[in-house]
C-alpha cells in the first residue's frame, strides 16, 4: 500500500508547488523560470545531457548534472543542433549549435487537471537535419489536455557516424533520445505531468526513432504507448549498412588521410572544426540533397559496452523481445512525395530535373532508394533497372511520367517497410497494434516547398497529417476542413495518451494483433472508415 501511495503523494506535492507559482519549477539542478504564453506555459531549452563538444564529441551522451547558482532562464526557444539543413534555400545551409541537447515542455492552462498525460515528441529530418523548434505545439496547447515535451537530439556526423566498432559505435542520436525520455520520466511530475502516462510521437525519422526506442524491452516500463507517423524501424532508410567505410571516406574529405585504425580516425575528427565537419556533408550529396541522410542508425559491434542496437530491428520484433506497448503506425498514399518532389524543380535553363534521371538513373537510384552500400555495383544496376521497368516500363523519365516515380518512391521507401513492421508486430507481439492512412491533400505542403512550384497537384504526401498535430509555417494557413481534422487528430492522440483507446471521430481503430488481414482506419477530408486489406503496399490504399 505504501508503494502505491508514495508516487501519488509526490505527484500531489509537485502539483501543489507548480500551482503556487507555475512559472517557477524546482529541479535537482536548481530553480528554473518559464514563460506565460496566454493559454499555456512553456519551459524551454532545459539541458538533459552535456553538450557533445571538445572531449565529449563522438562520445556516449552524459546526463547533465550542473547545479545552477541562479534561476535558470527557461524562456529561450530551443536551438537547432548543428546541421546542413535541406530547409535552407541558400547555398550555405549551415545552421545550429553543438550545445543543443535540451527538452522543452509545454503545459496547458487547464485548472480542471491536477496532472496531465504526456506526449514526448521526437522530430524528424532524414537523420541529418530538423529541429524541435520547427514544429509548434499550438494544436495541443489550445486543446489543453496533455503536456507536450519536445526533445532535441544530435543529427548528422555527431549523431550517427560509426566506425563499426567500439571506438565510434554510432547511434548517439538515439542514445540522446533514450536519455531524454528517462529525464522526462524522472522530472515531468515537477511540471504537472504524469510520469506513468507518457507516450512517444514522432514523424519521418522521428517515427522510425520512436519505433527503434521500442526495440528495448524495458521501455515498456518507461512509456505506455507510441505513435510512428510516416516512418518505422523497418523502412529501408532506418538502419545503415557499411557505416565504417563511410566514416573513413568522410574522414578523408576532412583531411584525415590514411588513418591506420578507428582510433586514429577519431583522434583526427575530434580536432576538426565542428562547422567544417558538418558542412562537409554536401560533398556526399550526389543530386540536390540526395542522399537525404548519409549517416544513420547502425547495428553496433558486440564489443560496445552500452549498445543501442545489437541486431536488426526486424529480428528483434520477430523474437518478441521488444517493448510491449500499444503502437500506432501511419502513412499517406503519396508518402514518397518528400523524396520525389525535388525532381519537379527546374534547373537554371527552366528544364525539370527529373529528366536527368534518363542518363543518371543507375548512378542515382541507389542514393534515392537507400541501397548504395548494401549491393555490389553490378547488382545495384540490375536492381535499379528492375525497379524502373516495374514502375515505368519502357517510358522515359519526364514530368508526364512523374507520378510513376512518386509511386515508386512511396512503395519502396515507405509502404513496404511500414507494412513489414505492422505484419511483424501482429504476428510476434503481445500488445495492440494499430494503423491509419491519411488521405486529404494539403494546398500548402512540404512537397510544394521542395518542388518550388504549386501548379501540380501532388496528392496527399508526407507531413500533410503530421503538421495538423504539430503546426508549421509551411502548412499555414489551414483550410477550414483541415482545422476540423486537426482538432480530431489532436483528440485522438489525447485519448490515446489518457486512456490507451484509439478513436478518430466515430471510427474505432481495430487491433491488428493476430489478424490475417491488415485493419486500417482511413482518414479523409470529411470522413473516416475502417478498411481491411491483405497488403496496403500492393493494394494501393487511397
Swiss-Prot record:
Tissue distribution of the protein: Specifically expressed in the ejaculatory bulbs of male.
Class of enzymatic activity (EC top level): hydrolase
EC number: 3.1.1.1
Glycosylation sites: 110, 396
Pfam families for this protein: COesterase
InterPro entries: AB_hydrolase_fold (IPR029058), CarbesteraseB (IPR002018), Carboxylesterase_B_AS (IPR019826), Carboxylesterase_B_CS (IPR019819)
A GO cellular component entry from the record: extracellular region
First and last residue of the signal peptide: 1-22
Compartment(s): Secreted
Keywords for this protein: Disulfide bond, Glycoprotein, Hydrolase, Secreted, Serine esterase, Signal
GO molecular function, one term: carboxylesterase activity
Keyword set includes Nucleotide-binding: no
Residues forming the catalytic site: 204
Main location: secreted
CDD domains per UniProt: Esterase_lipase (cd00312)
PANTHER family given in the database record: CARBOXYLIC ESTER HYDROLASE (PTHR43142:SF1)
Family per record: Belongs to the type-B carboxylesterase/lipase family.
Quaternary state and interactors: Monomer.
Function: Transferred from the ejaculatory bulbs of males to the female genitals upon copulation, plays an important role in the reproductive biology.
Name recorded for this polypeptide: Esterase S
Amino acid at each position: 500500500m505504501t508503494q502505491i501511495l508514495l508516487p501519488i503523494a509526490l505527484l500531489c506535492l509537485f502539483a501543489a508547488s507548480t500551482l503556487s507559482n507555475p512559472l517557477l519549477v524546482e529541479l535537482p539542478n536548481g530553480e528554473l523560470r518559464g514563460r506565460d504564453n496566454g493559454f499555456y506555459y512553456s519551459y524551454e531549452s532545459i539541458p538533459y545531457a552535456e553538450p557533445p563538444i571538445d572531449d565529449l564529441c563522438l562520445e556516449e551522451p552524459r546526463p547533465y548534472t550542473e547545479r545552477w547558482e541562479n534561476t535558470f532562464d527557461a524562456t529561450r526557444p530551443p536551438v537547432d543542433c548543428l546541421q546542413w539543413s535541406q530547409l535552407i534555400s541558400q547555398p550555405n545551409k549551415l545552421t545550429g549549435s553543438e550545445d543543443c541537447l535540451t527538452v522543452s515542455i509545454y503545459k496547458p492552462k487547464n485548472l480542471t487537471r491536477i496532472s496531465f498525460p504526456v506526449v514526448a515528441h521526437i522530430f524528424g529530418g532524414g537523420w541529418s537535419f530538423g529541429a524541435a523548434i520547427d514544429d509548434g505545439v499550438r494544436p495541443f496547447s489550445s486543446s489543453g489536455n496533455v503536456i507536450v515535451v519536445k526533445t532535441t537530439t544530435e543529427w548528422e556526423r555527431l549523431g550517427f557516424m560509426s566506425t563499426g566498432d567500439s571506438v565510434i559505435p554510432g547511434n548517439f542520436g538515439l542514445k540522446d533520445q533514450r536519455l531524454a525520455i528517462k529525464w522526462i520520466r524522472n522530472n515531468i511530475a515537477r511540471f504537472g505531468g504524469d510520469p506513468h502516462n507518457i507516450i512517444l510521437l514522432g514523424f519521418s525519422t522521428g517515427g522510425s526513432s520512436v519505433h527503434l526506442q521500442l526495440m528495448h524491452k524495458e521501455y515498456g516500463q518507461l512509456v505506455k504507448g507510441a505513435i510512428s507517423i510516416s516512418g518505422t524501424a523497418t523502412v529501408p532508410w532506418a538502419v545503415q549498412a557499411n557505416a565504417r567505410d563511410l566514416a573513413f571516406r568522410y574522414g578523408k574529405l576532412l583531411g584525415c588521410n590514411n588513418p591506420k585504425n578507428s582510433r586514429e580516425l577519431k583522434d583526427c575528427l575530434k580536432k576538426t572544426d565542428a562547422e567544417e565537419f558538418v558542412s562537409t556533408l554536401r560533398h556526399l550529396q550526389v543530386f540536390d540533397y540526395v542522399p537525404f541522410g548519409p549517416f544513420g542508425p547502425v547495428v553496433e559491434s558486440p564489443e560496445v559496452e552500452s549498445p543501442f542496437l545489437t541486431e536488426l530491428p526486424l529480428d528483434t520484433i520477430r523474437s518478441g523481445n521488444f517493448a510491449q506497448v500499444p503502437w500506432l503506425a501511419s502513412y499517406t498514399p503519396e508518402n514518397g512525395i518528400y523524396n520525389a518532389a525535388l525532381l519537379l524543380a527546374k534547373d537554371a535553363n527552366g528544364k525539370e530535373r527529373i529528366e536527368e534521371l534518363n542518363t543518371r538513373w543507375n548512378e542515382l537510384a541507389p542514393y534515392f532508394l537507400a541501397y548504395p552500400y548494401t549491393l555490389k555495383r553490378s547488382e545495384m544496376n540490375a536492381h535499379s533497372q528492375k525497379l524502373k521497368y516495374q514502375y515505368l516500363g519502357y517510358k522515359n523519365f519526364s514530368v508526364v511520367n512523374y507520378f510513376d516515380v512518386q509511386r515508386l518512391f512511396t512503395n519502396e521507401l515507405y509502404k513496404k517497410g511500414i507494412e513489414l513492421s505492422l505484419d511483424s508486430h501482429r504476428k510476434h507481439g503481445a500488445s495492440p497494434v494499430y494503423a491509419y492512412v491519411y488521405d486529404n491533400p494539403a494546398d500548402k505542403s512540404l512537397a510544394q516547398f521542395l518542388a518550388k512550384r504549386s501548379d501540380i497537384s501532388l496528392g496527399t504526401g508526407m507531413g500533410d497529417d503530421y503538421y495538423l498535430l504539430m503546426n508549421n509555417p509551411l502548412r499555414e494557413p489551414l483550410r477550414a476542413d483541415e482545422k476540423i481534422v486537426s482538432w480530431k487528430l489532436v483528440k485522438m492522440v489525447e485519448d490515446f495518451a489518457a486512456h490507451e483507446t484509439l478513436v478518430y471521430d466515430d471510427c474505432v481503430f481495430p487491433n491488428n494483433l493476430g489478424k490475417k488481414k491488415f485493419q486500417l482506419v482511413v482518414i479523409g477530408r470529411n470522413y473516416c472508415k475502417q478498411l481491411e486489406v491483405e497488403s496496403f503496399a500492393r493494394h494501393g490504399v487511397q
